[in-house]
């Protein structure tokens, strides 16, 4: 029997219309455009302002974009995985709701949470289902409404995050294209440095936790930056060595868009010039589970069949990793 690889055969994306620029943040907290941009690489981010819409709305729009571009009947989807750090509710999975709303009536669905590494870990999980031979079409959606868990009086976090979603369809491939290798890691020390304190079983919601703003993201920025710079760069470099790839063999690095300095450090360790690095953090900020797939979506027209691509991410937990894949189609042939 031929070896089955899991290849991405279609992608889609969605960001809300409302823009939150650095200039607008200057009026909200003590900061300025130059300070934000030089430290993060971010100029603006998108915000889903409608309080009646959650992460599921973003996910549904991204999935619909993929279905329209691919011309795919949603009933053909076998499994939908929603990668997200901001589900609609703590209980009642968001993935099954997204599946029902897009008409994927034959799919089962579940949520996956690994903070900013959610989509990367989701690629690994989606690939395993395809490689099993039992599933033909797996839809992975990375989506987050980060604005719902951000304190817009906290300069340390409100400048970083935005809302958005992206989707990727995985199908079997017999040409050696698709996911080739992965290095995924985690370290529980991370829970001390990047977290939402309240709202879980350890610290249930009370009037006091709400009053003390314990339901917003807290980040020890310096510590997280230190771990992220080394973690992402280490695994990206390791996945190249393990597959006997040089920097000349790699067409694209698709990094998690958390901070341009982290991205630059990872590219430098891999020996990659800026023109081989996908970058859209200036437009969207850190969309958490959506960054990698939104970058692929933005660069889709430039992707060629057979391109060697390295995906890399670092997130809370801590969680981090790198995935090496061979791209399965010519993006220039896709109708936007």
Write out the residue ranges for each language-model feature.
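Short glycine-rich phosphate-binding loop at a beta-alpha junction
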Residues: 75-83, 247-256
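Anion-binding (especially nucleotide phosphate/pyrophosphate-binding) glycine-rich loop
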Residues: 69-105
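Short beta-strand segments
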Residues: 9, 83, 113, 138-144, ...
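Flexible, glycine-rich active-site loops centered on histidine and acidic residues
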Residues: 131-165
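Acidic-glycine-rich active-site phosphate/pyrophosphate-binding loop
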Residues: 29-38, 89-103, 139-146, 201-209, ...
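Condensing-enzyme catalytic core mediating Claisen C-C bond formation in acyl metabolism
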Residues: 1-50, 154-226, 230, 234, ...
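Claisen-condensing/thiolase-fold acyl-transfer catalytic domains that form or cleave C-C bonds
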Residues: 56, 60-63, 67, 86-87, ...
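Glycine/charged-rich beta-loop-alpha catalytic/anionic-binding loops adjacent to active sites
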Residues: 42-46, 76-81, 100-113, 148-153, ...
């Amino acid at each position: 029997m031929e070896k089955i690889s899991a290849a991405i055969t279609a992608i889609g994306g969605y960001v809300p219309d409302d823009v939150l620029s650095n200039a607008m943040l200057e009026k909200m907290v003590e900061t300025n455009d130059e300070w934000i941009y030089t430290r993060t690489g971010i100029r603006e981010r998108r915000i889903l302002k409608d309080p009646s819409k959650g992460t599921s709305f973003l996910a549904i729009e991204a999935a619909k974009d993929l279905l329209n571009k691919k011309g795919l009947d949603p009933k053909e989807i076998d499994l939908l995985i929603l990668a997200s750090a901001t589900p609609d509710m703590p209980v009642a999975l968001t993935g099954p709701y997204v599946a029902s709303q897009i008409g994927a009536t034959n799919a089962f669905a579940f949520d996956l949470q690994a903070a900013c590494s959610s989509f990367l870990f989701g690629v690994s999980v989606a690939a395993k289902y395809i490689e099993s031979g039992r599933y033909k079409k797996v839809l992975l959606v990375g989506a987050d409404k980060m604005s719902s868990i951000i304190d817009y009086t906290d300069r340390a976090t409100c400048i970083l995050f935005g809302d958005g979603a992206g989707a990727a369809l995985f199908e079997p491939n017999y040409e050696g294209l698709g996911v080739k290798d992965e290095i995924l890691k985690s370290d529980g020390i991370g829970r001390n440095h990047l977290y939402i304190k309240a709202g879980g079983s350890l610290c249930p919601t009370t009037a006091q936790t709400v009053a003390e703003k314990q339901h917003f993201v807290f980040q020890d920025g310096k510590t997280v930056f230190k771990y992220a710079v080394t973690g992402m760069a280490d695994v990206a470099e390791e996945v190249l060595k393990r597959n006997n790839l040089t920097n000349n063999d790699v067409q694209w690095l698709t990094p998690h868009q958390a901070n341009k300095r982290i991205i630059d450090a990872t590219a430098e360790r891999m020996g990659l010039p800026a023109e081989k690095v996908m970058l859209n953090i200036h437009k969207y900020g850190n969309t958490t589970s959506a960054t990698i797939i939104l970058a692929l979506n933005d660069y889709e027209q430039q992707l060629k069949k057979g391109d060697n691509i390295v995906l890399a991410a670092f997130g809370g937990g801590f969680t981090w990793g790198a995935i090496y894949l061979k791209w399965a189609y010519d993006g220039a042939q896709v109708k936007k």
